[in-house]
Regions:
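Residue-level detector of family-conserved "landmark" positions at structurally sensitive sites
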Residues: 49, 60-61, 231, 241, ...
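Functionally constrained cores in energy, signaling, and assembly domains
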Residues: 40, 44, 104, 143, ...
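Short cysteine clusters
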Residues: 43, 127-133, 173, 221-227, ...
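Cys/His-rich zinc-coordinating "finger/knuckle" motifs
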Residues: 134-140, 180, 228-234, 238, ...
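Ferredoxin-like iron-sulfur electron-transfer modules
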Residues: 118-121, 202-223, 234-254, 265-268
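Redox cofactor-anchoring modules in respiratory/redox and cofactor-processing assemblies
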Residues: 1-213
Length: 268
């Protein structure tokens, strides 16, 4: 404010673009080297912020997804990284400025997992007054759970999109209208990832543990028994007295406890 008073409004309005003048403070997070609150010219692009200001994606990995607008925001692929950070450009890309925050993630992130978090947060925050938001978000969350746990079907994608569009136009407040952005943009830009979860039942980011099918590599198992005690359902037999462990997938709940307990990488 002091700089504007000193230099004048014309100086401040010289920054930005035709859609929006001046600057904006953004909250930056995700798999970037430097995060925090930073102020930018409104004409600055995602790419410029990530590479020139935040030091790029950490650990020399590649950008996979930009989550713009916070929990009520949406997802953008790397091809949209040249989008300026002004209101109209973000709307044209299918997302919102929202809380003026964005997170940049590498390939270790799963779009379905991120969408589940956003929808789950918004479901918990709904006041419950309108049916689209109160019931609709629960239905969407259940569908996302099905996809991430191996029960999804390809027709679920069209159902999800239709339900999200219905909530978007019938919810009574801004929360309900934007609560489904993560799902809509996820299906639009990352449909192949949704289909891989459904058809191949594989999460390349290894975030959806419900898709795991655990197998013990007998040649690597030393029968130490370390995997038996952490298992909450007693799904593991053997593993002692020189007998390799065996996992009963009918009892397994995909909690990942055995995988984390094995120090010999015998469980895959």
């Amino acid at each position: 404010v002091s700089a504007i008073l000193k230099k004048g409004s014309s100086w401040y309005s010289s920054m930005g673009n035709d859609n929006a003048k001046g600057t904006k403070v953004w909250a930056l997070s995700g798999n970037i080297k430097y995060n925090g609150l930073m102020e930018f010219d409104m004409s600055t692009t995602f790419h410029e912020v990530i590479e020139d200001v935040c030091g790029g994606i950490s650990k020399k990995k590649e950008l996979k997804v930009i989550h713009a607008g916070g929990v009520t925001g949406g997802f953008l692929p790397p091809s949209k990284a040249d989008t300026p950070l002004d209101y109209e450009s973000l709307l044209d890309a299918g997302v919102l400025m929202g809380q003026a925050s964005f997170a940049a993630y590498d390939e270790s992130a799963c779009v379905i997992d991120l969408a589940k978090f956003s929808v789950g947060f918004n479901e918990a925050e709904t006041c419950g007054k309108c049916t689209p938001c109160r019931i609709g978000l629960t239905l969407i969350k259940n569908k996302l759970d099905d996809i991430s746990e191996g029960r999804g079907k390809l027709e679920d994608l069209d159902k999800l999109q239709s339900l999200c569009e219905e909530i978007n136009v019938t919810a009574l407040c801004g929360l309900g209208e934007t609560a489904v952005k993560a799902v809509l943009t996820g299906i639009k830009y990352f449909r192949a990832e949704y289909e891989r979860h459904i058809v191949d039942q594989i999460c390349d980011a290894a975030r959806c543990t419900g898709l795991y099918k655990y197998v013990v590599k007998e040649e690597d198992c030393v029968a130490c028994g370390a995997c038996i005690k952490p298992c909450p359902t007693g799904a593991i037999t053997g593993g002692t007295r020189k007998v390799a462990a065996h996992i009963d997938m009918d009892l397994c709940i995909n909690c990942n406890a055995c995988y984390e307990a094995c120090g010999f990488l015998a469980i895959v």
